[in-house]
């Protein structure tokens, strides 16, 4: 049995769809029936992605984090359980609201997100230290940066102490110390996050510079591989043993990119945790993300393994 643990955020998504975003001081109409709510947060989305894209007979997925004592928290726990995610170590915080993300999705599928952390702010160092036994026994720990940074740092140290591989998705993007990066087995930023990690925020990764960016991030001590996602251009990887390649994205019409990155992380994590080759795992992740972007919603857009297995007509960009 492969044990995958996700430590991270859980948010309720409040989504508004619109042809274009309003400018400052401007009021516009969104799409008719364009408002929806649903479970989200990078942590929860990635846990759901791992669960839906794995076989429950050989994979256990657990969520670590906090929700508020409100209706959003109840719905979050119910949704995670329904997807087969273990929530025994999700803590309900009294007199706190569950995290909220306000998401504006344009006609092109591009999105803008505003976060209110709520109970996610209670995922502190004390919480993480109390989870040491759970972290120490997993095969892979997945983390993002929607919880307090000091909690992420402690979790990295615990995982390192027990020889547990960590996949870090450094989003939302903030600078990280070289020590923190060196505790990661897999570092998976997008083009903007990679630039911020390298203190080059004005120069996002492109096809022309992505190899140099990946090499520099590897030099900080990433143990196995750096994967830089490039949106519709795919993902570039470079491993510690020198292997590198661009894995093309699948050619589809995007409707909503909100959960594309989280689907990619979940799919890749499940595949690599089960011992699949790096490139094969990334190709699987690209296929899963291509299905996600053709649907509206966050967690609701993440496909199941059965759906992915049945989608053989996706073409790669050339």
From Swiss-Prot:
Gene Ontology terms for molecular function: ATP binding; metal ion binding; ribokinase activity
Regulation: Activated by a monovalent cation that binds near, but not in, the active site. The most likely occupant of the site in vivo is potassium. Ion binding induces a conformational change that may alter substrate affinity.
Listed CDD domains: ribokinase (cd01174)
Principal place of residence: cytoplasm
Cofactors, names only: Mg(2+)
Pathway listed: Carbohydrate metabolism; D-ribose degradation; D-ribose 5-phosphate from beta-D-ribopyranose: step 2/2
Stored Pfam families: PfkB (PF00294)
Binding annotation for K(+): 256, 258, 292, 295, 297, 301
Swiss-Prot/TrEMBL keywords: ATP-binding, Carbohydrate metabolism, Cytoplasm, Kinase, Magnesium, Metal-binding, Nucleotide-binding, Nucleus, Potassium, Transferase
Residues reported in the UniProt entry to bind substrate: 11-13, 41-45, 146, 262
Cofactor note: Requires a divalent cation, most likely magnesium in vivo, as an electrophilic catalyst to aid phosphoryl group transfer. It is the chelate of the metal and the nucleotide that is the actual substrate.
GO cellular component: cytosol; nucleus
Binding site for ATP: 190, 229-234, 261-262
Record-annotated active site: 262 (proton acceptor)
Domain of life according to the entry: Eukaryota
Reactions that this protein is recorded to catalyse: D-ribose + ATP = D-ribose 5-phosphate + ADP + H(+)
NCBIfam families, alphabetized: D_ribokin_bact
Role, per record: Catalyzes the phosphorylation of ribose at O-5 in a reaction requiring ATP and magnesium. The resulting D-ribose-5-phosphate can then be used either for sythesis of nucleotides, histidine, and tryptophan, or as a component of the pentose phosphate pathway.
Subunit organization: Homodimer.
UniProt similarity note: Belongs to the carbohydrate kinase PfkB family. Ribokinase subfamily.
Official protein name in the record: Ribokinase
Protein source organism: Schizosaccharomyces pombe (strain 972 / ATCC 24843) (Fission yeast)
């Amino acid at each position: 049995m492969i044990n995958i643990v996700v430590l991270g955020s859980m948010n309720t998504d409040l989504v508004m769809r619109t042809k274009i975003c309003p400018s400052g001081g401007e009021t516009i109409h969104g799409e008719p029936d364009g408002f929806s709510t649903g479970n989200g947060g990078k942590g929860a989305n990635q846990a759901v992605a791992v669960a839906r894209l794995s076989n429950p007979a050989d994979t256990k997925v657990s969520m670590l984090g906090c929700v508020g004592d409100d209706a959003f928290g109840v719905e979050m726990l119910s949704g995670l359980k329904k997807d087969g995610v273990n929530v025994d170590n999700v803590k309900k915080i009294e007199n706190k609201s569950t995290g909220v993300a306000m998401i504006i999705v344009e006609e092109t599928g591009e999105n803008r997100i505003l976060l209110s952390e709520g109970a996610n702010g209670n995922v502190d160092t004390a919480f993480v230290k109390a989870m040491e036994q759970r972290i120490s026994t997993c095969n892979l720990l997945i983390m993002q940066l929607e919880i307090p940074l000091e909690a992420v740092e402690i979790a990295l140290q615990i995982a390192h102490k027990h020889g547990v591989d960590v996949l870090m998705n450094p989003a939302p993007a903030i600078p990280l110390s070289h020590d923190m990066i060196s505790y990661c087995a897999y570092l998976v930023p997008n083009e903007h996050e990679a630039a911020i990690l390298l203190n080059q925020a004005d120069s996002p990764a492109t096809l022309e510079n992505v190899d140099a960016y990946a090499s520099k991030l590897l030099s900080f001590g990433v143990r196995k591989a750096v994967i830089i996602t490039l949106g519709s251009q795919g993902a570039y990887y470079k491993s510690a043993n020198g292997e590198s390649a661009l894995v093309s994205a699948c050619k589809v019409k995007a409707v909503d990119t909100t959960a594309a990155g989280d689907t990619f992380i979940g799919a890749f994590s499940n595949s690599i945790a089960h011992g699949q080759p790096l490139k094969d795992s990334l190709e699987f992740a690209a296929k899963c993300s291509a299905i996600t972007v053709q649907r509206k919603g966050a967690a609701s857009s993440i496909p199941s393994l059965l759906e992915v297995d049945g989608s053989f007509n996706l073409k790669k960009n050339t």
